[in-house]
Every structure is written in C-alpha cells, then in structure tokens.
Amino acid sequence: MSGLLRYLHCSPAWRVLRPAAPGMQGGRFRSNYAAEEGIEEEIQFAAARQEDPSSLYSDHIPTNAVQKLLLSAGSAVMALYDPYRHDMVAVLGETTGAVALRKLRDQMRRDPEGLQILQERPRIRMSTLDFQTLREMPDGTFGREYARFLDVNHVTPDTRMPVKFVDDEELAYVAQRYREVHDLMHTLLGMPTNMLGEVVVKWFEAVQTGLPMCILGAAFGPLRLNNKRMKKLGVLVPWAVQSGRNARCVLNFYYEKRWGQSVASLREEIGILPPPEIKA
C-alpha cells in the first residue's frame, strides 16, 4: 500500500489532491499549477501530458481504476470539508460520473438541438461571448440576466476548470458542457452563488443529471446552512426537485442562440417552474 501511495503521489493525477493555493478567492477556484508549483514545472508537466500517447484530448490525464478510486475518495472528503473547493468538486464529478454522463450523452444524441451541440461543440468562455452586447440587451432577456448574474456575483465563465479525468472524448465534452451551463442554471433558477443558492441548484441538477457529485452536494450541502436559510431551503428544494423532474434535459438547449429570448419564455420552454417567493 505504501508503494502504491508513493506512486500515486508522483503521478499527475495526484496533483489535484494537494491543498488549494492562496489564489482561491470568492468561492471559485482561481489557482493553477504555475501559481502553486512554478512556471517551469508547469511547462514540463504540460509537455509530458501532451506527449502521453494515451491522452484522448488536450487536458486529459489518463488514470487507472485504482487511481480513480483514490481520487474519488480523496476529492469527496475534501469537497465535503470545504464545498468551495470547486477543483475537488470537479474531480469528484469526473471520476464518479461515467454512467450518468453516458445517459446524458444519449439524451443529447436523441434530440436535434442536443445532437447539434455535440457536433459543433460550442464553448461558453470569455473568448467566445460578447459580454458588452449581453449587458446592453433589454432587461428580462436571458442574455441580459446572465450578464447581470456574472457581474453581481463577480464571476466569469472562465473560472470553470477543464475536464481532465473522463476517459472518453465525447463524454468529456458532455461533462464540460454541463460545467459551463451551471451558471446559466443559476440564472434560470434565479439563485445566487451563496451556499443556499448552490444547494438549490444542486438539487435541480441532481434530479436532471443523476451525477453522483450533484447528489452528494444536494444531500450534504444543507449541513452548512443556518436555521434561517434551512427554512428557505424547505420551500426551495421541493420546487427545485419538481422543476428538475418536469424539465427537459437542460443540455439539449443551444443557449448561445437564445440570448434574446426572455427568461420567462425560456423557463417555460425548458419546463422550469416559476421560482417561489421567499420572505426575507
């Protein structure tokens, strides 16, 4: 066992279980290997990864079953200890979500819009979106409200980490797409990025996707809420669960082509129920 742990500690996969660097701020993981380990080591690691013949896509880190098991266990413990370790949440989703990702991929293949997304592989990044145009859209449009969500919560789509541990190129894209539409779900559900908002979104996503990471977050996230927020959660969770069951697969919507659509209209098309009113 000690030999195995030494091997894993030296492997690229084990790097993700190191403590977060001081660059983590505002509830989103903002660190990278260059900040933690030095630019030279990052360049060497990236070059070695690209030269690995078993890599299936640019950020792929191949892992065997034992490595995946240890990564899953380690990331689960760290994610439960600190839910704002979004790097650990990401690793947990990738190492435990193979079955759910295949089901999501199959749903996308059966839907014309979902199939188009799989074929065209759009990305939601600062480099692919014109945020100034989104900010200038009329109030109530999906694009305007998404831009407002990002501005109010001081986040950007680039804070979403690239997929690394999914051993299938198409499933890796499905995982990346889920990750990049997460903030769009916040916008459509009207939820902020605080712990209450994240738990509500996780309940919706758990029902929608079946990803173990979402189920874990939905189940254990409430443990960090105070009594006042638990009362609000008692109203919001049934709505989130019902909306998740009622909604079509949220990955089957080409959101980049719907910025001008009203939030109310898009919610209705997807099947998301109107959010309940919560007393302050």
UniProtKB/Swiss-Prot annotation:
Cofactors named for this entry: Zn(2+)
Main location: mitochondrion
Entry EC no(s): 4.1.1.130
Membrane topology, record value: Peripheral membrane protein
Gene Ontology molecular-function annotations: 4-hydroxy-3-methoxy-5-polyprenylbenzoate decarboxylase activity
Chain coiled-coil ranges: none
Pfam families with a match to the protein in the record: Coq4 (PF05019)
Organism of this sequence: Xenopus tropicalis
Amino acids binding Zn(2+): H182, D183, H186, E198
Reactions performed catalytically: a 4-hydroxy-3-methoxy-5-(all-trans-polyprenyl)benzoate + H(+) = a 2-methoxy-6-(all-trans-polyprenyl)phenol + CO2
Family: Belongs to the COQ4 family.
Cellular compartment(s): Mitochondrion inner membrane
Pathway in which this enzyme or protein is active: Cofactor biosynthesis; ubiquinone biosynthesis
InterPro entries reported for this sequence: Coq4 (IPR007715), Coq4_euk (IPR027540)
Entry keywords, A to Z: Lyase, Membrane, Metal-binding, Mitochondrion, Mitochondrion inner membrane, Transit peptide, Ubiquinone biosynthesis, Zinc
This protein's name: Ubiquinone biosynthesis protein COQ4 homolog, mitochondrial
